């Protein structure tokens, strides 16, 4: 137990407009007990820890998921300290409310401005909560798909009441944060890499 190697913990910030279902998504992903009768209160700030199976030989990776207060009205920017520490961002919107998608463009611009030249994965989740009124939802989701393609970010359709819909976005994100170590086929390079790892230990 003392010799167990502790892997890097990926820090993921979940953000978006107030009332789009960020907390319900996280609670369902981590605990799996959210249903339409579950009472959730507006979030100030919460932290969840999830152990994620990325499907790579049974190895589990750890995500620390930060749930933030929803943005609304005049406050359409994330506080600056939220932009400094995350390794990845999950942007959530409700396709029934086009304003929630518009707000994500501002959040993404802030992330780009403060990322300090490092590659930070960003994922967009459409939290489809109601099956009624497909036309407005489809128009908003078409806009979201076009925007995500232009920004080169992944766009997923999920439902906070359906836990399996949340697996793919978070396992993919976790795999990007914890890439597999590749072994070189060149013996000389492999020897250099092994020597470097020994000197770092």
From Swiss-Prot:
One of its GO terms (molecular function) is IkappaB kinase complex binding. GO terms for biological process: negative regulation of canonical NF-kappaB signal transduction; Ral protein signal transduction. Residues 3-201 are annotated as: Small GTPase-like. The keyword Chaperone does not apply. Gene3D superfamilies: P-loop containing nucleotide triphosphate hydrolases (3.40.50.300). GTP binds at residues 16-23, 67-71, 127-130. SUPFAM superfamilies: P-loop containing nucleoside triphosphate hydrolases. Coiled coil: none annotated. Keywords: GTP-binding, Nucleotide-binding. A motif (Effector region) lies at residues 40-48. InterPro entries: KBRS, P-loop_NTPase, Small_GTPase. Pfam families: Ras. Belongs to the small GTPase superfamily. Ras family. KappaB-Ras subfamily. In contrast to other members of the Ras family, the members of the KappaB-Ras subfamily do not contain the conserved Gly and Gln residues in positions 18 and 71, which are replaced by Lys and Leu residues, respectively, and are therefore similar to the constitutively active forms of oncogenic forms of Ras. This suggests that members of this family are clearly different from other small GTPases proteins. Atypical Ras-like protein that may act as a regulator of NF-kappa-B activity, possibly by preventing the degradation of NF-kappa-B inhibitor cactus. Interacts with NF-kappa-B inhibitor cactus. This is NF-kappa-B inhibitor-interacting Ras-like protein. It comes from Drosophila melanogaster (Fruit fly).
């Amino acid at each position: 137990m003392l010799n167990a190697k502790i892997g890097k913990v990926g820090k993921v910030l979940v953000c978006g407009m107030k009332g789009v279902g960020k907390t319900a998504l996280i609670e369902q992903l981590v605990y799996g007990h959210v249903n339409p009768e579950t009472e959730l209160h507006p979030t100030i700030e919460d932290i969840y820890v999830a152990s994620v199976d990325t499907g790579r030989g049974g190895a589990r990776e750890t995500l620390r998921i930060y749930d933030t207060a929803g943005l609304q009205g005049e406050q359409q920017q994330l506080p600056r300290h939220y932009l400094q520490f995350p390794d990845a961002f999950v942007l959530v919107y409700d396709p029934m409310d086009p304003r929630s998608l518009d707000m994500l463009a501002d959040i993404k611009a802030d992330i780009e401005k403060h990322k300090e030249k490092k590659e930070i994965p960003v994922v967009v989740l459409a939290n489809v909560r109601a099956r009624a009124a497909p036309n407005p939802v489809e128009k908003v989701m078409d806009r979201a798909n076009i925007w995500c393609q232009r920004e080169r970010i992944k766009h997923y359709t999920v439902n906070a009441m359906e836990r399996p819909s949340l697996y793919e976005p978070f396992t993919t994100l976790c795999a990007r944060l914890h890439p597999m170590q590749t072994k070189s086929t060149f013996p000389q390079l492999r020897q250099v890499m092994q020597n470097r790892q020994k000197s770092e230990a």
